[in-house]
């Protein structure tokens, strides 16, 4: 079980010093531009603005281009927070309400014309500016919840911006200030046990104000022209098709010096230990939506790293191991249960499926009861998932492995529930609303194999209870945009842990997070009240008890149908060295090397 690196952070002070130096050593050599890692994404990116994007694939790119104050040790399990741009772990005073962070000196942004040909050093002001952007009303950041209500004086600046139409970035905020060029001080309203995770999460990455002001759109977002301090910079971008990254020549680098307690990592450590990083000079990412096309590209040695989705499992795996023919070629498999959750949500503001009225609750519960998760795991995922019965997945602090869900597959019970609340069947077999109007629900999904399979299973499920379903297809970025505006009625969504704590999942239904991470646009007073109480608690039995109460509220009102947590099966070509799937980090290129390949490669 992945326990948080900083669960006792405030009370037990700092993490072991050994971890503080893992990423601090200077590089000994420049990356080799002839070393290329080719990867594939199954869905398109939405952009490169840390404050604006909200999808896994864009977030992965941001991790490679920008830098947060903290990150995670590459091999440590459970996940451990370590410094990245910070020069050591924070100094914590005032009973955990004041955090002081020192920056490493001499970190440079990648070159850009906006800097006028001069070197641009990373400073404390950059982090102050970047974190303020999360709460700027004009940007409408989906990550505002990370800082709302937490930093002294910051909410007041946001409220003033709502009235004036302009966020005053120059106004001093006691909760986040640059003490000097390389020192940041955070003052919290209450002790926040998740602050270390937030400062390791890519929305808090440093951007340069002059870059945002030069390239930003009218809404304050700068989805193109990323300029960061990370190991890579954007070299070429063909939207929704190809992304090319190249090594940032000003990146300071580090020495690969990670340790692992897992004997299975011994060979990996031997082949990588002591190398100047990054070794990889270029990263080429292709967007290939169809499962079979991705597999063919991997088999044809056109890509080096690929996450194998469930539909491909029979072609690649025997149980949980690679088929012998792939093993014979030297292909490697890195496999974990992702700290993620797939669920179907219903828009709680929608006039057909939303609301807290008893008949609306009955409709959602009946639809949830009609869906057989076992069929999804068997048919769609080919066994590459486990059923999710609790809203916090395995490997995340707060997960309850013994939980007995109150929502089970029960089509007979679902039909009885609809009958009881006035959803009558017409002569054609389809149900109507209690007022006699037609009942039609609309599922939104991606136009790929997985999306079509999910459409079919949901239609089969709803057909069995007499609920007519239409399907709306759109590209992934457009679906994300629409759901943030509460415009979708029903969709299958996934959330992978930003940090390994249950709060990261329970916040998905917190009312004030609507238009950010609350895709169901739910405002359930009982849930919100309980969630607010958890914000003042450290991880432990008392908070876990509240999470259990919150889970019963979710089951009672059914804004979601919990579905699965997925296995992540990363296929790795034999010439790629150093890869191990991390439960939280998604950008891994700076930790890899590429061995010489045969003459036909």
Where do the PLM segments sit?
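Bacterial N-terminal signal peptides that target proteins for export
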Residues: 2-15
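Bacterial N-terminal signal peptides
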Residues: 12-24
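Sec/Tat signal peptide C-region and signal peptidase I cleavage site
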Residues: 25-29
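Extracytoplasmic/periplasmic ligand-capture domains
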Residues: 30, 74-75, 90, 98-100, ...
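Surface-exposed intrinsically disordered loops and tails
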Residues: 36, 115, 153-170
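N-terminal lobe/hinge region of extracytoplasmic solute-binding protein
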Residues: 40-94, 227
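A structural "hinge/loop" feature
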Residues: 43-61, 82-85, 113-116, 142-143, ...
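Glycine-rich and polybasic anion-binding loops at the starts of cofactor/ligand-binding domains
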Residues: 563
């Amino acid at each position: 079980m992945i326990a948080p690196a900083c669960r006792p952070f405030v009370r037990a002070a700092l993490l072991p010093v050994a971890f503080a130096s893992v990423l601090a050593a200077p590089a000994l050599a420049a990356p080799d531009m002839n070393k290329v890692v080719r990867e594939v994404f199954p869905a398109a990116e939405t952009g490169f603005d840390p404050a604006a994007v909200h999808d896994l694939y864009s977030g992965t790119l941001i991790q490679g281009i920008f830098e947060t104050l903290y990150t995670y040790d590459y091999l440590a399990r459970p996940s451990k927070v370590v410094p990245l741009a910070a020069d050591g772990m924070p100094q914590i005073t005032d009973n955990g309400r004041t955090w002081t962070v020192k920056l490493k000196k001499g970190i440079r942004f990648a070159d850009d014309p906006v800097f006028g040909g001069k070197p641009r050093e990373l400073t404390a002001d950059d982090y102050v500016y970047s974190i303020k952007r999360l709460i700027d009303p004009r940007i409408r950041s989906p990550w505002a919840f990370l800082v709302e209500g937490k930093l002294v004086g910051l909410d007041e600046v946001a409220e003033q911006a709502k009235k004036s139409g302009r966020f005053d970035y120059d106004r001093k905020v006691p909760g986040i200030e640059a003490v000097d060029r390389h020192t940041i001080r955070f003052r919290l309203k209450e002790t926040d046990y998740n602050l270390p995770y937030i400062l390791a999460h890519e929305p808090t990455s440093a951007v340069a104000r002059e870059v945002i002001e030069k390239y930003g759109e009218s809404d304050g977002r700068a989805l193109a022209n990323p300029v960061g301090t990370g190991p890579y910079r954007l070299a070429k971008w063909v939207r929704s098709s190809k992304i090319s990254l190249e090594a940032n020549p000003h990146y300071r680098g580090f020495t690969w010096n990670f340790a692992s307690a897992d004997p299975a990592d011994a060979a990996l450590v031997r082949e990588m230990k002591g190398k100047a990083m990054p070794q990889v000079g270029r990263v080429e990412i292709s967007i290939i939506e169809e499962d079979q096309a991705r597999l063919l590209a991997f088999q044809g040695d056109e890509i080096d790293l690929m996450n194998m989705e469930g539909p491909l499992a029979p072609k690649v795996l025997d149980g949980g191991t690679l088929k012998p023919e792939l093993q014979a070629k030297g292909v490697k498999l890195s496999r974990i249960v992702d700290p993620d959750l797939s669920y179907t949500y219903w828009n709680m503001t929608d006039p057909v499926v939303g609301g807290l009225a008893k008949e609306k609750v009955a409709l959602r519960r009946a639809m949830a009861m009609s869906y057989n998760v076992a069929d999804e795991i068997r048919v769609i995922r080919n066994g590459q998932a486990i059923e999710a019965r609790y809203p916090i997945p395995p490997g995340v602090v707060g997960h309850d492995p013994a939980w007995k869900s109150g929502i089970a597959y029960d089509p007979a019970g679902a039909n009885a529930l609809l009958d009881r609340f006035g959803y009558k069947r017409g002569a054609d077999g389809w149900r109507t609303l209690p007022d006699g109007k037609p009942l039609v629900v609309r599922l939104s999904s991606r136009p790929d194999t997985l999306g079509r399979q999910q459409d079919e299973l949901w239609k089969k499920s709803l057909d069995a209870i007499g609920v007519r379903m239409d399907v709306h297809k759109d590209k992934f970025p457009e679906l994300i945009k629409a759901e943030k505006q509460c415009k979708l009625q029903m969709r299958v969504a996934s959330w992978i842990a930003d940090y390994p704590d249950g709060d990261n999942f329970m916040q998905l239904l917190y009312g004030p997070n609507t238009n950010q991470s609350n895709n169901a646009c739910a405002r359930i007073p009982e849930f919100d009240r309980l969630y607010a109480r958890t914000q003042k608690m450290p991880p432990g039995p008392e908070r876990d008890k509240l999470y259990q109460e919150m889970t019963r509220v979710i089951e009672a009102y059914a804004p979601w149908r919990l579905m699965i947590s997925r296995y992540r099966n990363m296929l790795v070509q034999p010439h790629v060295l150093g890869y191990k799937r991390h439960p939280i980090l998604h950008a891994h290129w700076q930790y890899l090397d590429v061995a010489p390949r045969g003459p036909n490669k």
